[in-house]
Amino acid sequence: MANTKSAKKAIRVIAKKTAVNKDRRSRMRTFVRKVEEALASGDKTAAQEALRAAQPEIMRAAQKGVIHKNTASRKVSRFTQRVKALS
């Protein structure tokens, strides 16, 4: 248990930031799931639209520190390759 006033505040701040990061991660995963579903269905236009919507969410998560920037770049790159491979 926190003893000092500053330690108690730190616990409150961490709880808020954890909740925000959890929401951001969940939102990003939702967009990623939509891309996966579009790719699985084989619909190229749907996959392109889903990727177009997901890319800013993935990069925003990286910018906010929820995921590493290289992880975000790798996800976007691999999704782009898979969308281009659809014919």
UniProtKB/Swiss-Prot annotation:
Which keywords belong to this entry? Ribonucleoprotein, Ribosomal protein, RNA-binding, rRNA-binding
Q: Does Oxidoreductase appear among the keywords? A: no
Entry's Gene Ontology BP terms: translation
Source organism superkingdom: Bacteria
Which InterPro entries did the record assign?
Ribosomal_bS20, Ribosomal_bS20_sf
Q: Name one GO cellular component term.
A: small ribosomal subunit
Q: Name one GO molecular function term.
A: small ribosomal subunit rRNA binding
- What family does the entry list? Belongs to the bacterial ribosomal protein bS20 family.
**What function is annotated for this protein?**
Binds directly to 16S ribosomal RNA.
- Name assigned to this protein: Small ribosomal subunit protein bS20
Q: Which organism is it from?
A: Parvibaculum lavamentivorans (strain DS-1 / DSM 13023 / NCIMB 13966)
Recall the taxonomic lineage recorded for the source organism.
Answer: Bacteria, Pseudomonadati, Pseudomonadota, Alphaproteobacteria, Hyphomicrobiales
